[in-house]
Amino acid sequence: MAPEMDQFYRSTMAIYKSIMEQFNPALENLVYLGNNYLRAFHALSEAAEVYFSAIQKIGEQALQSSTSQILGEILVQMSDTQRHLNSDLEVVVQTFHGDLLQHMEKNTKLDMQFIKDSCQHYEIEYRHRAANLEKCMSELWRMERKRDKNAREMKESVNRLHAQMQAFVSESKRAAELEEKRRYRFLAEKHLLLSNTFLQFLGRARGMLQNRVLLWKEQSEASRSPSRAHSPGLLGPALGPPYPSGRLTPTRLDMPPRPLGEYGSPRSRHGSGSYGPEPAEARSASQLEPDRRSLPRTPSASSLYASSTQRSRSNSFGERLGGGGARRVRALVSHSEGANHTLLRFSAGDVVEVLVPEAQNGWLYGKLEGSSASGWFPEAYVKPVEEIPVNPMNPVAPMNSMAPMSPMNELPSRSYPLRGSHSLDDLLDRPGNPTASSEYWDSQSRSRTPSRVPSRAPSPAPPPLPSSRRSSVGSMGAATDVKKLMSWEQNPPELFPRGTNPFATVKLRPTVTNDRSAPLIR
C-alpha cells in the first residue's frame, strides 16, 4: 500500500475517534451542566419573585404613611419593573432550554450511533479495497514473471483500482472533516441564537430602566428635604438646621450613597460609614456630641465600628479640649498599614487630625489631613502641632507675640531643660491666681540658678478662669505671663552659667592600645 494512502487512512480514523471520544462526551456533559443551570435559574427566579413581592408590600406600607408616600410609590414601581424583567428573562431561559439543550441532547444520542457506523463502514471499505488492490498487484507481478499475454490488461486493471482507492481515501477524509465541522458549527449557531436572545432582552431592559432610574433618583433626592407636612415646631427654627436640636446622632439611612470611587480604597472603606459620608446637616448635628469610644487593645474593623456608634453626653471633644475641636499632630516618622487595612499610612511631616480624644493602649485614631484616609497609628510616631494660643481676655483673637510659626519666637535647640524638674509651661499651666504664679516664678528665678529653660514650643494658654474671678485678675495675670515668656524667648539663659558646669575641670587621659591583648595569628 502506498504511504500517502496509509497517511490518509490514519487521518480519517483520527477524526472519527475525536468525534466519538471527545466531542460527543463533551456535548453530553454540556447538556448535563445546562440542565443544572436551568434548575439554578428557576430557583433564582422564584427567590427573586419572593424578594420583590416583599419589597412591594413594604412600598404599600409606605403608601399608607403620611411622610413616605413618594418613597412607597418608588418601591412599588421598582418591584413591578424587576418582576417584569424577571418574566422577560424566563423567555430567554425557555429559548435556552428548547432551542439549545433539547437539540443538543437529541443530536448527541443520534450522532453517537451515526459516527460509529460511519467509522466502521469506512474501515471495512478501506480494507476491502486495499485487499483487492493488493491481490491484483500480486497477480500482475506473477503474470509479468511468466510473460503472460494478459499482463497488459491486468496492469490497466491495477492502475484503475489504484486510482479508485486514492479517490476513495481522499473523499472519505473530506467527509470526516465535514462531519467534524458540522458539529462545531451546530454548537456555535445554537449559542449565537442564545446570545441574540440575551441581546434583545438587555435592550428591552435598558429601555425600560433608563428613564425610570433617573426619575426614581430625582424623587428620592427630593424626599431628603423636610416635608411640608411637618410643623415648624418639630423641625426647630425656620432658618435653623433641618434636624431638630435634640437630635445628636443622624441615622445612617439619611446619608447619601457612597461614591463609586471609594470602593477601591481599603483605607477609605474601613474609615467611612456603611452608607457613605454624612451630609452637611447631619454633620453639624453630630459635632454637638462626638464619640466616647471604648477600644480594644489592638485596632480592628469591629472596634472602629463600635467606636463610631457609642455616644456619651458627659464626655465630648468640646469639654476635653475647651471647644477647640479635634487636635492635630505631625508625623515624626513614616507609618505603613501593612496587611492590616485599619491602620493609617502616612509619611514623615504629614499632619493628622486626631479623632479619638485619648490614646488607647498607645494607639490613636485619626484622619490624614488633605485626604479621606483614616485609621489607627502609634502615639509615639507623632508630636502635637504648635497651636496659636488664645488671649484670655479675648478668646477670639490670638496672641501675635506667641505665634509658633514665627522664626523669631522659636527657641534654639539647646533650650530643652537638663536638670530642672519644672518648666515655664508647668508654671503657666498651674491653676489658681495668675499673680501668685508670677510671684512664684520671680522668687524661683532669684533664688536658683537658671539651669532650666522653657521648652521649644510654648504650650497653649491656660483655660479661662470662672467668670467671677476672670473679671478681677484676668488681665493682670495674662499680661505678666506674656511678659515673662517674651523675656525668656528674646534672652534665653546660658546653658551652663559660669561656675556651674560640672564637667569644666574634667581632663581626659590619652588612651594607649595594649597590643598584647590581641589574638595570636599564625
From Swiss-Prot:
It comes from the Eukaryota. The modification Phosphoserine is found at residues 231, 272, 303, 472, 475. It holds the Pfam family IMD. It is found in: Cell membrane; Cell junction; Cytoplasmic vesicle membrane. Residues 297-317 have a biased composition (Polar residues). GO terms for biological process: membrane organization; plasma membrane organization. Expressed in the epithelial layer of the intestine and in the kidney. Residues 1-239 form the IMD domain. Residues 443-456 have a biased composition (Low complexity). GO terms for molecular function: identical protein binding; phospholipid binding. Changing residue 155 to A: No effect on lipid-binding. Phosphoinositides-binding protein that induces the formation of planar or gently curved membrane structures. Binds to phosphoinositides, including to phosphatidylinositol 4,5-bisphosphate (PtdIns(4,5)P2) headgroups. There seems to be no clear preference for a specific phosphoinositide. This is BAR/IMD domain-containing adapter protein 2-like 2. It comes from Mus musculus (Mouse). The gene is Baiap2l2.
